[in-house]
Each structure stands twice: as C-alpha cells, then as structure tokens.
Curated annotation (Swiss-Prot):
Residues 409-416 are annotated as: G1. InterPro entries: DNA-bd_dom_put_sf, EF-G-like_DII, EFTu-like_2, IF2_assoc_dom_bac, IF2_II, IF2_N, P-loop_NTPase, Small_GTP-bd. Residues 434-438 are annotated as: G2. It comes from Edwardsiella ictaluri (strain 93-146). Residues 48-313 are annotated as: Disordered. It holds the Pfam family IF-2. This is Translation initiation factor IF-2. The gene is infB.
Amino acid sequence: MAEVTVKSLAAEIQTSVERLVQQLADAGINKSPDDSVSPQEREALLAHLNREHGGSSDKLTLQRKTRSTLSVPGTGGKSKSVQIEVRKKRTYVKSDAAAQQAEAEALAKREAEEQVKREAEEQTQRDMAELAKREAAEQAKRQQEEQAKREAAEKAKREAAEKEKVTNQHIDEKTKAAQAEKAKREAEAAELKRKAEEEARRKLEEDARKVAEEARRMAEANEGKWTENASEEDNSDYHVTTSHHAREAEDENDRQVEGDRRARGRGGKAAKQKKGSKLSESKADREEARAVNRGGKGGKRKPSSLQQGFTKPAQAVNRDVVIGETITVAELANKMAVKGSQVIKAMMKMGAMATINQVIDQETAQLVAEDMGHKVILRRENELEEAVLSDRDTGAAAEPRAPVVTIMGHVDHGKTSLLDYIRSTKVAAGEAGGITQHIGAYHVQTDNGMITFLDTPGHAAFTAMRARGAQATDIVVLVVAADDGVMPQTIEAVQHAKAAGVPLVVAVNKIDKPEADPDRVKNELSQYGVMPEEWGGEAQFVHVSAKAGTGIDELLDAILLQAEVLELKAVRNGMASGVVIESFLDKGRGPVATVLVREGTLNKGDIVLCGFEYGRVRAMRDELGREITEAGPSIPVEILGMSGVPAAGDEATVVRDEKKAREVALYRQGKFREVKLARQQKAKLENMFSNMVEGEVSELNIVLKADVQGSVEAIADSLRKLSTDEVKVKIVGSGVGGITETDATLAAASNAILLGFNVRADASARRVVEAENLDLRYYSVIYDLIDEVKQAMSGMLAPEYKQEIIGLAEVRDVFKSPKFGAIAGCMVTEGVVKRHSPIRVLRENVVIYEGELESLRRFKDDVNEVRNGMECGIGVKNYNDVRPGDVIEVFETIEVKRTID
C-alpha cells in the first residue's frame, strides 16, 4: 500500500494543506506537508473532527432535480422546445450502525436503479430528438416539393399537353420515393425504441429482483431496526414523485402523449375533425395521472390544505351558554353558534320583536336559549361590588343609638312648627309659602337623650320624599290637625309607615283651637288601622300645640318610650354606612349630599361609595352649618367631595380603596344604562298598535332645574301626571343646580320652556335666553309652578266650538225674486236676524236645511240686521223650497276656551 502524505490527503479530501496541518495539530498529531499519515492517525483525525463539529444529523433529506429539453414539432412545420424538470425528494432517519449500513446499501441500489432509468430516458429522448429532426427535414423537403409542384403546374398550363404528362409522372415518382423513405425511417425508429424499452425493462426487473432479495435478507437480519420516515413528503409539492407507482404513471402518461402526437401526424384531416375529443381525452388522462401522483406512497398522502375540511354535524350541538345580566341578540346567537335570524325568529314565536343589536335582559335570553335546547349558566356580574362592600370593619359590638323620627302629615297641619318648638328655632318662616319643600334633618338633645328628626313635605307632589323618609326612620310621628281631621296626605303617610313596618306616634296638633275635635281624629284614623292605646291598639295619641307648647314634653317621652321598646342599637366604631336624605349641587362647593349615618363613624377623609357616585369626604357640616370631623350613628351630616350629585335614597357606604370604588360606580352606571335600554321594549308587538293609535299629540317640552334632588323628582312626577290624551308633558332635561348655558341651548333646540325652582340663570344662560327669545320662569312655591304649566297646556288644547241661537223668524209668505229666487217674507219672533249668518230651516220643528242667509231686506232696503217684532224678507242661499209656516233659525258659532282640570 502506497504511503499517504499530508499533501495527497489534502488533495483527496479537497481542502488546503495548511488547514489539514492545523487540524492534525489540533488532534495532537504534529506533521509537515511532506510527512506520511498512517491509518491510525487518519482515524484519530476523523474522531477529533467528529467531536469538534458534531455527529451527522439524524435526518437526511435528498433532493434531486433533473432537467431535459424535448423538441416537439408544432404547427406550420416549426418545432418548439419544451423544458422538462423532474423533482425528487426523500427523507431518511438515522437509527443504529446496522440500519445505517443497510440504508446505505438500499440507497446505492436505488441510485443504480434510478441511473439505469435515467439512461433509458435519455436514450429515448435522444431517439425522439433525432426522429423530430428527421421529421422536420422531411417537412421542409415536402414544402419545397409542394412549391415546385405548384410552379410546375403553372408552367404546365402554359406549355403543351405532352409536357404536362411527363412532369406529373416525374412528380409522382418523387412522392412515392419520399413516402417509402418516410415509412422506412418510422419503422427503424419504432424498432429502436422497442429495443431500448425492452432493455430498460429487463434491467429494471433484474435490479428489482436483486433489491427485493437483498431487502429480504436485511429484514431478516435486522428486523425492526430501521424505518424510513416519509412524513416530510406530506408537505412536499404535488410534483414530487418518489414511489414506484408514481414513476410508472409518469411513463404511461409520456407514452400516451407520444402516441397522441404520432396519431396527429398520421391522421391528417381525420385528426383535425377529432381534435376536440382528443384534447378532452388527453386532459382526462392527465387529470387521472395527476390524481395517481397525488396519491403518494401507497395512497396515504393527506388531502390538500386548500380542500374544504368542514363536515356538517349529524345532529344539533347543545352548548353551555353563559349569560350576564344583559346581552345583545348577536352575542347570544354567537354563544349558541346559530344565526341571528334564528334567535329573532324564536323571540317572535315567544311574542317579542327584537333587532340583532338590541339589548335583552337575562330572563328573556334564558328563555330563548333553553327553548333552543341549550344549557344556560347565569353569571353574576356584581362580584366586584359584593367584594368591595363585604370588605369592611363591622365586627364591633353594637351599642344603643338615638332614634330617627320622621315627622309626617298633611300640608299645613303644623309639622314644621312642631319641630320648630322642639328645636327652638324659626325654620317655618324661612320656607317659601310657609310649606316645607325639602327634607330637613336635625338632631335634638333632650333631657332624656338625643333624637334625630326628619321633617318631610306634606304636599301631594312629595310622595317619593315621604316614602324615603319612612324607609330611613325608626319611628313616624303623624301630625294631624285637630280642626281639619284626616286628610289625603295623612292617609298616605299611614300607608308609607305600614309599608315600611315603622311604629306610629300620633300628635294631634292645634289642640288649643276652639274648633278642635280630638275624638274625631281618633275615629277617622281607626278606619285606617291606627288604633289608640286606650282603645286596645298600639298607637300612642298625644295632644300638642305647636304655638303654645302644650304637650311637647309628653310627645318626646312617648318617642323615647317607643325607642326603648324597639331596642335600637348600632355599631359605633368601624366603617360607616348610611342613606342619602337629600342632595344638591352648590355652585361654590360642588355636589353636596345630606347623609344620615346608620352605623359606624363617618370621618373626614373617608372614601364613600354612593349609588353611581363616589369620592373622598373633603368636608362635613352639621345641620347648623358648623364644620365637624366625625359623625356617629343617627347623626345627619352634609358631606362634600362626591364625583356627582347622588340620587336621594341611595345607600352611602365607606370603602377601603378609591380605585375599586370608582370601578364599582362605573359598573353601576353601565348596568343601569343597559337595564334601562333592555326595558325600553318599544318594538314589542303589544306596543306597536298603541303607538299607531296615538297619532298627533301636542307636546309641551320642559327643561327643569331645582335646588335639590328631591324637588326635581317631586316636580317632574307632578308635571308628568298632568299629561292628557291631547297634550303630553315631556321633560327633555332636568337637574340640580343653577340654569346654565347648556340648559338654555337645550331648551332652544327642543323648543322647550325653562323652569327654575329656587335657582337662577347665570349670565351666559341669560344671553342665550335673550338671543333665542326663550320662555324662562322662576318659582319658589310648587303650587304656582304647577298652575302655570296647567295654563300653558290649556293654551295647547284644540279649541271647542259652540253654536248659539241669536234669532228666530217665522215665514208668513213666499214670493219670487228674479235675482235671488224664492224670498221668504218673515216676522222676527225672537232675538236678532243678521245678514251672512248661518241659518237652519225648520219645518214642524225638524231641520230640513242648513245654510247661509244671503239676502236680508226691509221695505226694499238692504239691512244688516232686523230686530224682534219686525218684518223682513229673507233670501236663503242655494235653497228655494221655503214654505209658509217654516221657521228660520239664525245662529252664531263661538269658540269655547278649554282648560286642564
């Protein structure tokens, strides 16, 4: 064996000598370029390189491209070249050494097989190329001969007949020789191709037999040790043909194309006639072959990713549908995986019409989903709210607290005067019109303990205020005037107290008046379930006089006695909670809320969550306007610092985190809006007809501003109750605080009148009012406001017309006039007859005609009127059937002004 030097080894492995010397040095072998390298050193170098550069990959992918050019004859004798590219790809997975050796041997066998096949294909392509060249030469020769033939034919016409015969014979001989030569060449080409195909087939069969035998032996020796991974073929192109079946399909397709080409060459006109059918057949063949190629190995290839993979479900799928408090129809349809039209159809069957974007409530959505066969899961969306409200310090021991007493009764029965005497102040004189229009909250220190009083309005408009007062109280003091007795608001106060489950203490006021009758009050109240203690009931009756101060101490004792029976207790230490008694917007201080603390201690700086609003308590004041820093149970306070004006009656709760309080307030606002939209089902079937029947109804638009929230509610409710079938009151805007430019602009846009109750318009609002000529009115007493709105509504009512008889004339005779026709000679028996007045003709007290008096004369003179007891001639317009004895009734139509009752 010849020695292998470093230089020869570098040339053999195709690398530079310097790099090989460096690699040998890295492997611990110091050599110069001329030194010899032993086999052991070569193995050490190979092991070093394997360690440095890592072993071979577990996967081996072979990609081959074979390009060839095929010359195909085209139309007009021209040949065109077609580029053919065959792409092949195969992936192998490395197993152990034996598997690698077997794989290498199998790969060598396959390469030999492919080499034989390629040689056969190349030989066939060369033969076809030679054949195409010969055919092209023959085609050119035939064209030349045809040209010569045409020239000879033209020449033959000019020459003699004997020359034409000689020329034709010569041409026929040449044509026959050319055809014989062509047939001979075609036979030779077919024989060559047949021999090449037989040789290739024989080699393939022999190689396949050898490969099968070798594979059988290797499978027996190394069973289960090597597998070929063909997974990569799934993602390869459709042109990748690696299986034996695919190669056979390609060969068959090539043979068919070649046969079609030859048939076109031989067929002549017949081939042209069958061109369409041949094209369709060859296209079908190509589609079939392409389908075979796509089949891959053993038909296991996956379908194309472009194919539709959806299969229609055999039956409806029942889903778990999660529904919140509100949901749109489109969202519900998506959760059930159905079309929105199906949900709308189901709702219409249930009697509700809805659009696809309409918000529906939880109950409706639950009914629809269950009707369509799905399981409903109701979701509670107020988890954050509950978590915030439950995270409070309320575990301290309860202590006795002062009672909260509400003074209720009919208007002008002396509620505020009674409370005045107790507080020793003059509050009643400060109220406009001498009536209470706000809830006043006061706490009074008596000899026997502290009492918190709430003074509610007695007017009918303040029903909601009285209801809030009854809910926030422990004891109700019902004030009844001894001279008036039980009145409508007295009965209403009894109903509120019973609904809230609050005990009653009856104060019979104005006992010092001569016409006072306390027994009458007891009898009337007993009809409504309020029985005195002396009659076996539970209600305490105390006779008082707010002016003279009679019985005040007895009333306080009765209140404290009732409080002891109730055993009122509250947690004093801890986070406070209470109820909003009243709220308003102060121009200098912002939103102000009067809060009655129920439990805990409200401190300055606490974070308060109140309905839709939240905020930090910036300042606290008592009912006298004094600054305080804390307020315990049963103490009413004014707090500043809320984000907006809370609604009266809202729960005020102290929480820990301002951020969470803001989230809860925003959630409540959103929920309120969604629920409001869900309940506005104007598209329901039962409402459609009522909307159509209403027709044209006059509307009185009003923008209302008041000083406190309770007054806004009371006035708005009273105004809405004034609506009739012909005129409706529509409050387009309402709020707490002064009249601003925005309010004036809204009134101008909606053609509304501006009403201010105990508030005034600012300078910018007044400018808009003057520019737009708006109707702006101020009020301080609710009676005046309601009366003027009634007058405005009366002006919008359609007028009524009344017919009033002004005169009667008896027909004595009838004569003719060439100008007016029949003229009735009459005697005025009653009233006055006026010209151009409407009349009725009565015959035997039955109206037979109604028209107009056209002509009125007395002694040939036209007159405007004829009085009682005088004769006249009357011409009735467009009526000539007047007879003696008829009565002509003259009347006027007068307008009667209507009012709102």
